[in-house]
From Swiss-Prot:
It is found in: Cell inner membrane. Its EC number is 2.4.1.227. HAMAP family: MurG. UDP-N-acetyl-alpha-D-glucosamine binds at T15, G16, G17, N123, R164, S191, Q286. Belongs to the glycosyltransferase 28 family. MurG subfamily. It is a peripheral membrane protein. The gene is murG. This is UDP-N-acetylglucosamine--N-acetylmuramyl-(pentapeptide) pyrophosphoryl-undecaprenol N-acetylglucosamine transferase. Coiled coil: none annotated. One of its GO terms (biological process) is regulation of cell shape. One of its GO terms (molecular function) is UDP-N-acetyl-D-glucosamine:N-acetylmuramoyl-L-alanyl-D-glutamyl-meso-2,6-diaminopimelyl-D-alanyl-D-alanine-diphosphoundecaprenol 4-beta-N-acetylglucosaminlytransferase activity.
Amino acid sequence: MSKKRNNLLIAASGTGGHIFPALAVSKKVEKDWDIHWLGVTKRLDSEFVPSKYNLLTLNLETPKKNIFRVFQYLKILFSIFNIIKILKEKKINLVFTTGGYISAPTILAAKWLKIPVILHESNLIPGTVTKYFGFLCEFVLLGFKDTNYYLKNCKTIFTGTPLRDQFYEINPLPKWVPRGKGPLLIVMGGSQGAKMINEIFYESIDFLIKQNFRIVHIIGENNSNNLVKFKSNNYVQKKFTNQIASLMQNCELVISRSGAGTINELIQTGKPSILIPYPNSKNNHQEKNAMILSSIGGAILMNQNQISKLFFEETLKRILKFKLKKGKPKYEILDLMKENIKNLDTLKSTNEIKKLINYFLKEF
């Protein structure tokens, strides 16, 4: 007779910012728990959640600002009944969630059944779910210490944001990355891509190639129809890559949005960056995230609505200016930015979160 196991439901869906921290945690605790994953149809979940986890999906949509918004919220609300059914059928002992609109009905369903919930908030400014439903959770885990200021009615614990194992390992540069003597730039817009960053970059691509920069451009899955065909030995364009840790560890500069996951990856790898926050993020949280690095001189923050081609190019020229020292380029500004990033604390947060999750293990 097989030994009875504890059942953990992970509710994480939508963007890499929600999915990747949950994946890092699930890998740490999978030996002790049977993992069931609650996601949303037609999102990134099916691509990244391993088949060994029991992936369950609900047909929900992100509430948009249109005449159907009320119906979309009602659909999320009514999904509580489906989630209650799942929690009962799978005999769930604990729920772990990383925010997003899948989290709210999951927290309410678990609360109804008196199942404990652990919620992780990776942004500096807490999202809507954390703000309004965090008090219902057993613990709210924080990616940044200062987030505690906004959550006085929650049981908070600072753990940092869990990253995938590859960020704690030394990874060689992928073979498909351009080789050469020029500095390596990584341009990306998060797991879904960023159309505006791509457009800003395309305007300056000729300039960048002439400067002998090597470029890896991650355009995002949602922007595959906006490919610009540009041939150069120093330029590679990809929809997505699972080797992002390797790229960040071996590059000179990252140009990116400023989701919480990206900020933590930059801190872990110690890489300077140009951060272009998504201007329509909830509570302007991406700009607040970016300021964690820009305020200490570890990143340059650019306002999307104020970037010009000239300003973008001049900024790159200035920070990538180098002097030859013993035959090797020395990037004085980048080196200073790297030193500034070292002042920030990093935690192997997956170990801390594992301890908290395993606190709820039941003996059978």
